[in-house]
């Protein structure tokens, strides 16, 4: 078994909506990013790539490459997952923690879990997503952006 950890952060800028966990969430602010700015899927992709020792999302999909301008992070996650499976890994489970003062995530989390399970070809019981605030402390608490952490467990497939 192998464990990977991922982290991502994006600052608010421009107008919304925002995309988190593949879900379009109405909000007055947008997130500044080269791709769609999905902090949850970026952190998750990094966790999965880290567990498989395949580097990180920036190495695989550099923000200097115009091909990834405005990229759908679900597509990036699926491509990373294909590469991980090619190395002989299956999914144990993933756990994602979104850190944001606003907008509230609770009503959107079930759909995030559905999308992640679809993209990884796994059961919903293998995907956990939760959200928390920083009690108005730090940059997320001041409403300057959103952060996310993710952990992934991979299992080497039996030969």
Curated annotation (Swiss-Prot):
Co-factor binding comment: Binds 1 divalent metal cation per subunit.
Gene Ontology annotations of biological process type: isopentenyl diphosphate biosynthetic process, methylerythritol 4-phosphate pathway; terpenoid biosynthetic process
Protein's UniProt keywords contain Lyase: yes
Known EC number: 4.6.1.12
Gene3D superfamilies to which the protein is assigned, alphabetical: 2-C-methyl-D-erythritol 2,4-cyclodiphosphate synthase (3.30.1330.50)
Quaternary structure, from the entry: Homotrimer.
Name of the molecule in the record: 2-C-methyl-D-erythritol 2,4-cyclodiphosphate synthase
Taxonomic lineage: Bacteria, Pseudomonadati, Pseudomonadota, Gammaproteobacteria, Enterobacterales
